[in-house]
Amino acid sequence: MGTPELKIILEFSAGAELLFGNIKRRELTLDGNQKWTIANLLKWMHANILTERPELFLQEDTVRPGILVLINDTDWELLGELDYELQPNDNVLFISTLHGG
């Protein structure tokens, strides 16, 4: 029997993808032996896939104001924000509302 896996989908929209190598969708397979919360996921993203200007995405241990986070099309504020525990096949969407002009 293999190591348990947690498969999720990350999506980036409205400019957020520019901070992640211009990739709008990523399918991730995470270590299923670990409890994965949004807080843990953000740390993993910072260490592994955030390629440009982290200060535009993260502020301390959370996303910056102006970055909307939807988990399975539901605002993360309704689901516990950083404490939300990721489930198999979750879709986590990051939308930037920060636009130059």
Swiss-Prot record:
InterPro entries: Beta-grasp_dom_sf (IPR012675), Mopterin_synth/thiamin_S_b (IPR016155), Urm1 (IPR015221). The keyword tRNA processing applies. The keyword tRNA processing applies. Keywords: Cytoplasm, Isopeptide bond, tRNA processing, Ubl conjugation pathway. Gene3D superfamilies: 3.10.20.30. It is found in: Cytoplasm. Acts as a sulfur carrier required for 2-thiolation of mcm(5)S(2)U at tRNA wobble positions of cytosolic tRNA(Lys), tRNA(Glu) and tRNA(Gln). Serves as sulfur donor in tRNA 2-thiolation reaction by being thiocarboxylated (-COSH) at its C-terminus by MOCS3. The sulfur is then transferred to tRNA to form 2-thiolation of mcm(5)S(2)U. Also acts as a ubiquitin-like protein (UBL) that is covalently conjugated via an isopeptide bond to lysine residues of target proteins such as Prx2/Jafrac1, Ciao1, Eip71CD and GILT1. GO terms for cellular component: cytosol. There is a cross-link at G101 (Glycyl lysine isopeptide (Gly-Lys) (interchain with K-? in acceptor proteins)). Belongs to the URM1 family. Its main location: cytoplasm. HAMAP family: Urm1. It comes from the Eukaryota. One of its GO terms (biological process) is negative regulation of JNK cascade. CDD domains: Ubl_Urm1 (cd01764). Interacts with cer. C-terminal thiocarboxylation occurs in 2 steps, it is first acyl-adenylated (-COAMP) via the hesA/moeB/thiF part of the MOCS3 homolog, then thiocarboxylated (-COSH) via the rhodanese domain of the MOCS3 homolog. This is Ubiquitin-related modifier 1 homolog. Pathway: tRNA modification; 5-methoxycarbonylmethyl-2-thiouridine-tRNA biosynthesis. The modification 1-thioglycine is found at G101.
